[in-house]
């Protein structure tokens, strides 16, 4: 079955969502409306186990997603970072190194104002 060819983007601006958990880093590039253009993760590249959580794997994932998005016409992104994983800084640097212009960086990690009590382990 043939792969569907993606169309060029109508606007060269978009949003980069970086979800950096303790075990994996997921990079999703969307248009300004929030529709996904492309995505990549440390696991989808081929890393398994503890190697997925490394900053190097996060950088490669961001670079892979950025190259596909640039081919489709993306030039400028707003970066939204979510999570406390080790790969978030490297992912941002890789997006810039791949050729995307970063206009803003937002940390959108949800932080409770002393909400629900966590289960045994995190306490």
UniProtKB/Swiss-Prot annotation:
Key words of the record: Ribonucleoprotein, Ribosomal protein, RNA-binding, rRNA-binding
A GO CC term assigned to this protein in UniProt: ribonucleoprotein complex
Entries under InterPro entries matching the protein: Ribosomal_uS11, Ribosomal_uS11_bac-type, Ribosomal_uS11_CS, Ribosomal_uS11_sf
Region feature (Disordered): 1-22
Entry annotated with the keyword Protein biosynthesis: no
A Gene Ontology BP annotation from the UniProt entry: translation
GO MF entries: rRNA binding; structural constituent of ribosome
Cysteines paired by S-S bonds: none
UniProt keyword RNA-binding present: yes
Pfam families: Ribosomal_S11
Similarity comment: family membership: Belongs to the universal ribosomal protein uS11 family.
Self-association state and partner proteins as the record states: Part of the 30S ribosomal subunit. Interacts with proteins S7 and S18. Binds to IF-3.
Its biological purpose: Located on the platform of the 30S subunit, it bridges several disparate RNA helices of the 16S rRNA. Forms part of the Shine-Dalgarno cleft in the 70S ribosome.
NCBIfam families: PRK05309.1, uS11_bact
Protein name as annotated: Small ribosomal subunit protein uS11
